[in-house]
Amino acid sequence: MESKSRRPTLLSRGQLRLLIWGLPVVILLLSLLGPESQPDAVISADSDRRIYQQVIPQQTLFRLHLIAPHPPALDASIQLRQRLITQAWIMRLQKPDELGDWLSAQGWEVQVQANTGYRLLQLKSDKPFADNDVRQLLQQLQTPPRVDWSALLQRTQAEQYMMRQNAEVSLTSPPSSNEHPSLDPLADYARQLQPSDWRITLTGPEPLSLSSVIFDPAPSPAPSENLMLSLKPLPVSPAADVQLQLHRWTLPQVHSAQDFAQLLLGRELVVQPLSHWLKQRLADAPAHQTGYSLRWEATQGGGLASLLLQGEQWPEIPALLLQQLQPENVETARQALLTQLEGDTGRQQWMDLLALYQLPPDSLQRLPAQLEALELSAMQQWLQSRLLSDYYHTLSLPH
């Protein structure tokens, strides 16, 4: 009888016993070590710095922000024109017979926001955004809505009037002017919302290949003499319950990560001495109505800073801000900014600023090093150039 050949075993009984006893120990060690750390997500941009993108694996939705820059309003008439176009833009997005039904069919969640220097359209989707859909959206957005423009202007005038009747809003709003320019709403709408003017930021669980073809323009409508409107804001006479004083200055253009770092650090260095002075003031006289608000408004050309003071006996603001600028203040401001950068919240809002200023996509990664390199003397010079410039001005509204 032939003997059957035995197949060689991969592991002996002793080795199997060792593996069985040792495997739980290995699993325990791996669990204690925790998951492998993931590198920070890198922001990328196309060659024209029009589309900024960041892959966030743990994010379940795709988020697309569309940014349309425009100059800040210099007077009430220009503000009225911008508000009119913004209201028409919102109607175009929301009315079912305009873009409302089309957006619903895409399954997109839509939010709009109007800022001093740009309009922002935020889209959320559980499916990737495609070139053709985004291109179609931008081209349709350039088409004005079918609306009674005279009635819309009257409604916008009334809304502007109600806002400017508020003392604080009136003081921080653009001033009134004796000039009342005319407007062709169809042509102006199409000009302000050209596809080629939009910038994009995009985050999602996987990269998308959006291309510059989405910015191809649509034909602009011909001007119509029958639709010429006169931009005449309604006069207001606001009354304040407490002394109000506005301090406003321009913010410089941002061309690099260093400019961006100075802009952000400068804001923190304005907030610190104001908060410190106000805290002492309220401790000494808690019954006094005293406070402040600071608006740091980003625009394509730099921005505007508006400081509104409430109450009396405030010190001279330029002197206060410059005298309180010490090395420890710079370090505190730097750490506050680094804490903001490390947080996950507001990640895409940082990218929106990169797109608005068209900065290199690695600017946020370089920001900690740029902040560390900014010394006291550089920030003194930067802040002094803002507070002592010809563009610095003050307005007051007595109670």
Set out the residue ranges of the language-model regions.
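M16 family metallopeptidases and their MPP-like homologs
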Residues: 60-82, 98-142, 155-180, 197-202, ...
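A generic N-terminal leader/anchor concept
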Residues: 1-108
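Short beta-strand/turn micro-motifs at beta-sheet edges
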Residues: 51-56, 107-112, 187-189, 233-237, ...
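A generic structural motif
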Residues: 151, 217-233, 293-296, 327-336
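Extracytoplasmic/periplasmic C-terminal soluble domains
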Residues: 158-253
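C-terminal regions of mature proteins
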Residues: 2-52, 183-214, 338-399
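Short, polar/flexible loop-turn hinges at active-site or ligand-entry regions and domain interfaces
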Residues: 143-147
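His/Glu-based metal-binding/catalytic segments typifying zinc-dependent metallopeptidases
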Residues: 44-88, 217-280
